[in-house]
């Protein structure tokens, strides 16, 4: 394994303390992680050292690590997939920074996110919803979201910026049944592309020897670990959505899909304006296909949200469009007029608490405050501002996100209000006149601001 002198490790433990306190203006400290090795698209050996401000000594592990992601690999600031191993290269599990005991971790660079926190905040909201899948009574410890902690990362002694150390969403987190006596029970799929993942395409020939199918990848059973997987449960759902008559769909959709989970996801994805999560960047799973083939869902990779897309650009349609309208949902709407009424009632219940504007804003504000008070914001700016044509300004981005939340929630109040009877925003403003987000007429729109014109949100470019 990747070797490192024990004396150097002890020295690094002392340096951790210095690194976390080296900014005289810092009021707080963030955990520091240092990784050693040469990393590529495939796993290579390395070392990871974790310095927790609440611990006296650092934790040191052998690891295998590689670049993680699809398009994110094109950016200079890389994501890393990390697997902890022992001195013999065998799987090793450990709890890091108070999170779950596991061997597989993600170091999320958040390179396209000008706030460096969108995905984390989205998961914080989802976790606060505390949504339970249909098999919760059998698995009370099931979790459909992940925990994550912000850290400052050093790559081979060079500062590499703010990262979020995340858990993985996997069979273990979702408490799916393991293979037993060579019989597949729990299954877990992930949407990585738009091809097929919105359940609008006819089923195609498939092979259980392949890890991919129509934009899905199998997470469990994993072909690499088990030699095969099981695609049939997913194909059955695809066939049901595409080929069922309206009468059959109306009578049976609740047997096929976890409807309460769909309701919460409808609200989450629309609240954050996640433009890349209707099928892609979503998990699909069944607890035990030998007993019940009902499918449930969970979100993933929600960085294209809160007003920006996967390139970090302002995405105007994210302000006043719906973003969770895959074919499962649209066909439920077609055959069951009560579905959106129930979603709307749930939405307005959540609006009183964790989806109140100030509640959502405060989640961002706490992380922005953490970055500022630890000095991490300054270091991130110095290291990465302008790289890959992405300009950083945390104060401006905070205001941008606040503005998005006000506009987006006003739009959703109107949309869901049509189904619940709740009306607490004015009717559409039109006639080509420009208004600010508070409905006041604007005679001199300023570049870089968002306004309302003809009932739509418009971003005036610089």
Task: Please annotate each region the language model reported.
Residues 450-462:
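C-terminal tail/sorting-segment detector
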Residues 60-61, 71, 75-76, 219-279, ...:
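Middle-to-C-terminal accessory/interaction subdomains
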Residues 21-26:
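Boundary at the C-terminal end of the N-terminal hydrophobic targeting segment
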Residues 2-12:
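Bacterial N-terminal signal peptides that target proteins for export
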Residues 27-121:
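Conserved NTP-binding catalytic cores of kinases and kinase-like/nucleotidyltransferase enzymes
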Residues 88-89, 95, 100-112, 116, ...:
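Internal "kinase-insert"/substrate-recognition segments embedded within catalytic cores
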Residues 417-438:
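Residue-level detector of functionally pivotal "anchor" positions at catalytic/ligand-binding pockets or at interdomain
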Residues 10-20:
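Bacterial N-terminal signal peptides
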């Amino acid at each position: 394994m990747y070797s490192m002198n024990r004396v150097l490790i002890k020295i690094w433990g002392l340096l951790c303390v210095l690194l976390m306190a080296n900014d005289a203006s810092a009021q707080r400290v963030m955990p520091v992680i240092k990784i050693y090795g040469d990393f590529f698209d495939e796993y290579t050996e390395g070392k990871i050292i974790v310095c927790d401000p609440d611990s006296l000594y650092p934790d040191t592990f052998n690891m295998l690590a590689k670049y993680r992601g699809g398009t994110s690999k094109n950016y200079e600031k890389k994501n890393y997939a990390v697997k902890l191993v022992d001195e013999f290269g065998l799987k090793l599990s450990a709890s890091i920074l108070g999170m779950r005991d596991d061997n597989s971790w993600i170091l999320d660079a958040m390179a396209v996110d000008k706030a460096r926190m969108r995905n984390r905040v989205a998961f914080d909201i989802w976790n606060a919803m505390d949504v339970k899948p249909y098999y919760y009574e059998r698995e009370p410890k099931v979790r459909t979201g992940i925990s994550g902690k912000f850290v400052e990362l050093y790559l081979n002694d060079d500062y590499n910026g703010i990262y979020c150390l995340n858990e993985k969403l996997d069979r273990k987190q979702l408490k799916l049944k393991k293979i037993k006596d060579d019989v597949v029970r729990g299954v877990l799929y992930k949407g990585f592309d738009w091809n097929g993942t919105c359940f609008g395409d006819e089923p195609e020939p498939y092979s259980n020897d392949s890890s991919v199918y129509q934009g899905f990848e199998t997470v469990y059973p994993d072909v690499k670990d088990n030699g095969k997987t099981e695609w049939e449960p997913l194909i059955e759902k695809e066939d049901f959505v595409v080929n069922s008559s309206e009468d059959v769909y109306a009578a049976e959709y609740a047997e096929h899909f976890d409807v309460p989970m769909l309701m919460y996801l409808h609200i989450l994805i629309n609240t954050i304006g996640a433009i890349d999560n209707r099928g892609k960047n979503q998990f699909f799973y069944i607890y035990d296909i030998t007993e019940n083939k009902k499918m449930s869902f969970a979100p993933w990779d929600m960085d294209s949200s809160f007003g920006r897309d996967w390139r970090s650009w302002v995405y105007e349609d994210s302000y006043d469009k719906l973003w969770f309208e895959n074919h499962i949902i649209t066909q439920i709407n077609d055959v069951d007029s009560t579905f959106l009424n129930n979603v709307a009632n749930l939405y307005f219940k959540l609006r009183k608490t964790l989806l109140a504007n100030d509640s959502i804003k405060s989640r961002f504000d706490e992380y922005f405050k953490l970055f500022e008070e630890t000095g991490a914001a300054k270091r991130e700016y110095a290291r990465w501002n302008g790289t890959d044509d992405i300009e950083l300004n945390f104060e401006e981005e905070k205001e941008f996100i606040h503005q998005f939340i006000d506009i987006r929630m006003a739009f959703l109040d109107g949309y869901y209000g049509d189904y619940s009877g709740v009306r607490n925003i004015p009717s559409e403003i039109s006639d080509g006149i420009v208004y600010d987000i508070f409905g006041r007429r604007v005679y001199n729109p300023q570049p870089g601001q968002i306004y309302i014109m003809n009932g739509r949100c418009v971003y005036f470019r610089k």
